[in-house]
Amino acid sequence: MAKFLDSIAGFGVTFGSMFKKTVTEEYPEKPGPVAPRYHGRHQLNRYPDGLEKCIGCELCAWACPADAIYVEGADNTDEQRFSPGERYGRVYQINYLRCIGCGLCIEACPTRALTMTNDYELADDNRADLIYEKDRLLAPLQPEMTAPPHPRAAGATDKDYYLGNVTAEGLRETQKTGESR
């Protein structure tokens, strides 16, 4: 008798769910909201004047447990300046076939050059397209930015860039006159 009642209870759950409204996710036509702190695709950031934040130190590659990042640094010159410091990341690659999305590379970056966006659609039908080169990782230039290579802001030091004292127009006025903010 108990087995019979168990099966009736199971059928009751089934019949009850038959009359509930079905919830269908219409993805990819209507993608849902993404969590604000979601770790998606990586992005190489820029300073407000357009220079790259990456200094080619390779700490992100050392921190990556999956060995998914390859960085080759090069020296900046006065004629060809890509970042405010001595060096820049000449070659930067992230292999998304290996990346596990742990974020250790983000924590290792001393200049906050590498961050993760909310972009989660990384699927592709070609394996070679999942190895992102520097041109696909760099943040897009904003209208007020100047495309590198170009000299750093007049009178600015590496420290000014790191502290955020450089804008698209140049070094902030409070820093030029020696005032503290």
From Swiss-Prot:
NCBIfam families in UniProt: NuoI, PRK05888.1-3
Database matches in InterPro entries: 4Fe4S_Fe-S-bd, 4Fe4S_Fe_S_CS, NADH_quinone_OxRdtase_chainI
The protein's Enzyme Commission number: 7.1.1.-
Source organism of this protein record: Mycobacterium marinum (strain ATCC BAA-535 / M)
SS bonds (residue pairs): none
UniProt keyword list: 4Fe-4S, Cell membrane, Iron, Iron-sulfur, Membrane, Metal-binding, NAD, Quinone, Repeat, Translocase
Name of a matching Pfam family: Fer4_7
Function: NDH-1 shuttles electrons from NADH, via FMN and iron-sulfur (Fe-S) centers, to quinones in the respiratory chain. The immediate electron acceptor for the enzyme in this species is believed to be menaquinone. Couples the redox reaction to proton translocation (for every two electrons transferred, four hydrogen ions are translocated across the cytoplasmic membrane), and thus conserves the redox energy in a proton gradient.
Name this polypeptide is given: NADH-quinone oxidoreductase subunit I
One Gene Ontology CC term in the entry: plasma membrane
Record bears the keyword Membrane: yes
